[in-house]
Amino acid sequence: MEKKEKSDEVIRLTDIGKSYYIGKQEVPVLTKIDLTISKGEFVSIMGPSGAGKSTLMNILGCLDRPSRGSYKLDGEEVARLGDSALAYTRNRKIGFVFQSFNLLPKLSALDNVILPMIYGNVFKKERRERALRMLDSVGLGDRAYHMPAEMSGGQRQRVAIARALINDPAIIMADEPTGNLDSKSTKEVMEIFSFLYQEGKTIILVTHENDVAAYATRHVILSDGHISKDIRGPLS
C-alpha cells in the first residue's frame, strides 16, 4: 500500500535567490526559487553539475542564507533568526547526511553519534544509551567502538545516518549520500532512507543518480539555478 503524504507544510521558499561576487561582479547561482515541501514527503533534488543543487541544500539546511527572498521553516521566517537560534534549529529540527560522511576520525562510531546530543543538553548516561540503540537500529551495534578508519564506506555512512537521527529531527537532508559507495552499500543506505520515510520523516535528497532518486516520491529538477521541473511520482 502506498504511503499517504501528509499535507502540513514544513518548508516554503518564495522568490529565493543566491549570488556570489567575484570582485564587483555578481554571479547568480539560484534565481527565483519557489518551493513548498510538506511534512512526510521524500523529495529528490536533481540537476547537472553547477545547477545549484548543493547551494539550495545549504539554504534549506540553514547552513547558508539566501541573498534575497523568503524561507519559512515550520512557519518561522529563517531570516529573523540570529546565529544562536539558527544553530539550535539546525541541531534540533534537521539531521544532515553528507557524501564525505563528515565523521570525526579520532572519535569512535559511538562518540560520533553522541556528539549532537552534547549540544542538546542530554545527560551523559542517556547519551550513551541512546547512541547505542541508534547504532543498533542501523545494523552497527557491533561496531560501536570502531574508529571510522576501521569501517567500510557503507558502515561510515550508516554511522552518519545514526548521528543525523539521534536528536529525532523531523527533517533529514542528504547531499549525495551514496556518492562514495558501491552498489551494495548504496542499496543498504537507501533502504534506511525508505524506512525513515515510511516512519514519517521528511527527507530531502540531493543526487545525480536516477536509481537513487527513484526511492523518492517527488523530484525537483534544477537547471541553471532555477527549478525546471517538479515531478510528483516516478521519474519518466
Report each predicted region and the residues it spans.
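ABC-family P-loop ATPase nucleotide-binding domain
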Residues: M1-S19, K229-S236
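ABC family nucleotide-binding domain
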Residues: E9-L222
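H-loop (His-switch) and adjacent beta-strand-loop-beta switch element
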Residues: H219-I231
